[in-house]
Amino acid sequence: MVYQLVAWTDRGQVKLLPELLREYAQPYIERIESLKAFYDEGWDDELGRLTEQDVIALSRSYEEYGRFLRLHGKCQEAFEAFVNAASVCLDDRFKIDSEYGYVLVGVLPKRFHAAESLCLDLIEENPALTRLPKWQRLQERFRELEAPFAEERRMIRRELHANRAFNFGRR
């Protein structure tokens, strides 16, 4: 009887042989590719137009794939999957023109923040990930979306500081 090493643990992470990792990752990749085809097309004759739920499904698929990769010690690949999960939520097709400027509609901003928090968790473990171009592009796109609210946030912060100063020492 011959035994073959297929997996081991290293610093709390399960490591697999590369060919096994590719085999186990295949269902995640296939799901992402099928959803991405519809996402890129934006329209399907049978299903209709692209909806928020389609974008969220694609984002969650990227997240599941990222969690799989992270579990198996592929930190940078997991980070890229999490960045993809966040970036699909910033789709221009789901922006509306409001009195403040262009803003995302529905639950997409919340989904973006959920995926971004996974990225930030990995950045805490490995700060070098912030230098990846994908992460920097994602941050730039998000700043563009948040720009209409910057003045409002500054005003709220100013009022909060004034209120704290006014109430300093009172009980």
Task: Pin down the residues of each PLM region.
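C-terminal leucine-rich, beta-strand-based interaction scaffolds used for sensing/assembly
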Residues: 1-63, 67-77
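Alpha-helical junction/boundary sensor with strong preference for TPR arrays
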Residues: 35-46, 88-89, 119, 126-129, ...
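TPR repeat positional signature
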Residues: 55, 62, 97-99, 136, ...
